[in-house]
Curated annotation (Swiss-Prot):
Family, as annotated: Belongs to the alphaherpesvirinae HHV-1 UL43 family.
UniProt xrefs under InterPro entries: Herpes_UL43
Membrane topology, record value: Multi-pass membrane protein
One Pfam family hit: Herpes_UL43
Keyword Transmembrane helix: yes
Protein name: Membrane protein UL43 homolog
Keyword field contains Transmembrane helix: yes
UniProtKB keywords: Membrane, Transmembrane, Transmembrane helix
Annotated TM spans: 43-63, 67-87, 93-113, 124-144, 159-179, 182-202, 259-279, 294-314, 332-352, 379-399
CC per GO annotation: membrane; viral tegument
Chief location category: membrane
Subcellular location: Membrane
C-alpha cells in the first residue's frame, strides 16, 4: 500500500492499494487482471450460495409437502434482514455458519449414501433437519455477502445482484429435475464448494474493492472499522472535529430523507402477495398468469429494468421520487385489476415490486457516501430481501391447494 501526499487523492498514479491474498496484484486503478479474476470467482461463489439457499427452501417444501413451512422460512429471511449486526460479529457468525452448512451437508449426504440401511422415516427426519440447518446458515451467509458487495464499487454491487438471481434460477431448477443420484451429487458438491471459502472477504481483498472503498470513505481501514471526520459547531459556536464511525450511523435518518424510495417497494412487497392470493381465490389453478415460470420471469425483468433505469434516476433531479410514485401507482392499478379478476395483474405487480426494490437499493447505496454508506447498504439489503420474499410468497400461493 502506497500513498503519495504531494498528489491529489483519487488520481490514478497516486494511490496503490494492493491485495494481501491475490498474487501478482498490481493495485492500480488502471486495471488488475489477477484481482478481476479473483472478484469473478467471488461472484460465482456468491451465486452458488444463493443457489444453495434457494435449493434448501425448495427441498424443505418437497420433503414436508406443507406450504406453511415454506412461508415460515421465507418470513424468517425477512426478519433476519431487519437485524443489524456489526461487521466484526457478522464475520464470526459467517465463519461458524459456513462450518454448519458444510457439516449439515455432509451428514445429509452420509444418510443418503446409507440408503436402505436407514429407515425411510428416520432418513426423512434427518435429511429435513440437515437441510433446515443449511437454510439457517445459508441465510446468514447470503446476507453478509450482500453487505460486502454493496460496500464496494457500483460494478461489484450490480455483479453480485446478477450472481444472486442467477444462483436463484439455478436453485429453482431442483423443481424441474427428478431427484436421482447425479442431481443430488451435484447439489452436495455445490453446497460444499460454497462452504469452503468466505467469498465476501475474498471480494473485499481485491485492489478494485479497496480503491473503491477509499474513494467513498477516504480511509484505508476495512469494512466496518472506518471513521470519517467532520467540522461541527457546539452551542458556543466553537468549531470542533467530530468522529463519525460507520457502524454508528443511524438507519432512521434515511427513512426521513428518502421515504418514497424506501417505502414504495416495501408496500409492494406486502401488496403483491395479496394480489396473487385474491386472483388465486378467483381463478384457482386455472390462472395461466400464476406459474413458477412467471415468477422467475418477473424477477429477471425487474432486475434488468432497474439496472437500466439506475443512471437516469441517479443523474436527473426528482426522478427517484417520480419513479417511486409510478411504482406505487402501478401497485394501486394492479390491486384494482385484481379486484375485477384480471389475471395479468399478478405478474405486473410482481415485476413492479422487483423493479422498485432493486432500483431503490441501487439508488440508496449510491446516494450515501462516506461513513453513511454502510448504514445505507443495510437498508438496501432489506429491500433486496423484500423482493425475494415477495417472489417466494407468490410462489407459495401457487403451490397451495
Amino acid at each position: 500500500m502506497m500513498y503519495q501526499p504531494d498528489r491529489e487523492p483519487g488520481e490514478d498514479s497516486c494511490l496503490v492499494l494492493s491485495s494481501s491474498s491475490v498474487q501478482r496484484c498490481t493495485g492500480s486503478q488502471r486495471g488488475c487482471m489477477p484481482c478481476t479474476w479473483a472478484a469473478s470467482k467471488a461472484f460465482v461463489g456468491i451465486g452458488l450460495q444463493a443457489c444453495v439457499l434457494t435449493s434448501s427452501i425448495l427441498h424443505i417444501d418437497l420433503l414436508t409437502r406443507n406450504s406453511t413451512c415454506l412461508i415460515l422460512m421465507i418470513i424468517s429471511m425477512y426478519v433476519l434482514s431487519l437485524i443489524r449486526v456489526p461487521i466484526s460479529k457478522m464475520e464470526t457468525i459467517v465463519t461458524v455458519c459456513r462450518s454448519i452448512q458444510a457439516l449439515a451437508t455432509l451428514v445429509a449426504a452420509s444418510v443418503w449414501v446409507a440408503g436402505s440401511a436407514v429407515k425411510k422415516e428416520h432418513l426423512l427426519i434427518v435429511v429435513t433437519v440437515c437441510i433446515l440447518f443449511v437454510f439457517i446458515a445459508g441465510t446468514q451467509i447470503s446476507l453478509f455477502y450482500v453487505i460486502c458487495s454493496a460496500n464496494g464499487t457500483g460494478t461489484h454491487f450490480r455483479a453480485s445482484l446478477l450472481a444472486i438471481i442467477g444462483g436463484c434460477v439455478l436453485g429453482v431448477s431442483v423443481k424441474l429435475v427428478e431427484l436421482k443420484d447425479v442431481p443430488i451429487g451435484i447439489g452436495i458438491a455445490i453446497a460444499i464448494i460454497a462452504s469452503c471459502q468466505d467469498f465476501g472477504l475474498a471480494l473485499r481483498d481485491t485492489c478494485h474493492y479497496r480503491i473503491g472503498r477509499y474513494a467513498c470513505m477516504r480511509t484505508f481501514t476495512d469494512l466496518g472499522r472506518g471513521i470519517n471526520y467532520r467540522w461541527v459547531t457546539d452551542v458556543e459556536a466553537v468549531p470542533k472535529i467530530e468522529e463519525v464511525a460507520e457502524e454508528k450511523v443511524s438507519l432512521f435518518k434515511f427513512f426521513k430523507e428518502m421515504p418514497g424510495v424506501i417505502f414504495s417497494p416495501a408496500v409492494g412487497t406486502h401488496a403483491t402477495p395479496i394480489i396473487w392470493i385474491v386472483l388465486r381465490l378467483v381463478y384457482g389453478i386455472s390462472n395461466v398468469w400464476q406459474t413458477p415460470a412467471y415468477v422467475v420471469f418477473c424477477l429477471t425483468v425487474g432486475h434488468v429494468s432497474a439496472m437500466l433505469l439506475e443512471q437516469l434516476v441517479i443523474r436527473v433531479n426528482y426522478t427517484a421520487e417520480a419513479s417511486s410514485g409510478i411504482h406505487s401507482t402501478a401497485h394501486a392499478v394492479c390491486m384494482v385489476l385484481a379486484a375485477f379478476g384480471y389475471g395479468v395483474a399478478a405478474p405486473l405487480s410482481l415485476a413492479f415490486t422487483v423493479s422498485g426494490g432493486i432500483l431503490g437499493a441501487l439508488y440508496l447505496r449510491k446516494r450515501a457516501t462516506g461513513a453513511r454508506r454502510l448504514a445505507a447498504t443495510h437498508i438496501s439489503r432489506w429491500l433486496i430481501v423484500c423482493v425475494y420474499v415477495a417472489a417466494g410468497l407468490c410462489y407459495a400461493t401457487i403451490i397451495t391447494h
